[in-house]
Swiss-Prot record:
Role: Involved in unsaturated fatty acids biosynthesis. Catalyzes the dehydration of short chain beta-hydroxyacyl-ACPs and long chain saturated and unsaturated beta-hydroxyacyl-ACPs.
NCBIfam families: fabZ, PRK00006.1
UniProt GO BP: fatty acid biosynthetic process; lipid A biosynthetic process
Entries under Pfam families matching the protein: FabA
Protein family: Belongs to the thioester dehydratase family. FabZ subfamily.
Organism of provenance: Acidiphilium cryptum (strain JF-5)
Keywords: Cytoplasm, Lipid A biosynthesis, Lipid biosynthesis, Lipid metabolism, Lyase
Record EC number: 4.2.1.59
Active site: 64
GO CC terms of this entry: cytoplasm; membrane
Record's subcellular location: Cytoplasm
Enzymatic reactions: a (3R)-hydroxyacyl-[ACP] = a (2E)-enoyl-[ACP] + H2O
Protein name (record): 3-hydroxyacyl-[acyl-carrier-protein] dehydratase FabZ
First-listed, main subcellular location of the protein, grouped into a coarse class: cytoplasm
Length: 165
């Protein structure tokens, strides 16, 4: 290199961030079902890391379980799906606005340890492949660097139906 060129692959590898406003533009989920607070690293068409600050005030803790609050595993999987949906929308770009990401399948879901109030869930999602409008992902959720859940899942990217928000 002669020192004048730009190394775009290094810039892409650094990724970018998406705040809560960007997440809410990208996906339709809202309280109490919006399960990511920010995306701290996103490399379009490759991977994303979402963050969920798990608060004792989460509505699901009222019944899961009183006196021993544990985040339901299916909601950890949903946080993985929401992180992947932001990755898809950021990859497709604004020209594809109006698309919705629907779960198709979940494989090999494993839950390694409970997620409790005060935990910061870091959701690492990597695109395995996509063919047409079907995308497949691998994900691992971690707390303090320790894996708490993992799954492989597929999603279909579709147009919003008329009348859908």
């Amino acid at each position: 290199m002669d020192g004048t060129s730009t190394d775009t692959s290094a810039q892409q590898a650094e990724g970018r961030t998406v705040d809560i406003a960007g997440i809410m533009r990208a996906i339709p989920h809202r309280y109490p079902f919006l399960l990511i607070d920010r995306v701290v690293e996103l490399v379009p068409n490759v991977s994303a890391i979402g963050v969920k600050n798990v608060s004792v005030n989460e509505s699901f803790f009222q019944g899961h379980f009183p006196g021993h609050p544990v985040m339901p595993g299916v909601l950890i999987i949903e946080s993985m799906a929401q992180t992947a949906a932001v990755l898809v929308v950021e990859t497709l770009g604004p020209e594809e606005a109006g698309k919705v990401v629907y779960f198709m399948s979940v494989e090999g879901a494993k839950f390694r340890r409970p997620v409790v109030p005060g935990d910061v869930l870091r959701i690492h999602v990597a695109k395995e492949r996509n063919r047409g409008n079907v995308w497949k992902f691998n994900a691992v959720a971690r707390v303090d660097g320790v894996a708490v859940a993992e799954a492989t899942y597929a999603a279909m990217i579709m147009d919003k139906k008329a009348g859908e928000g």
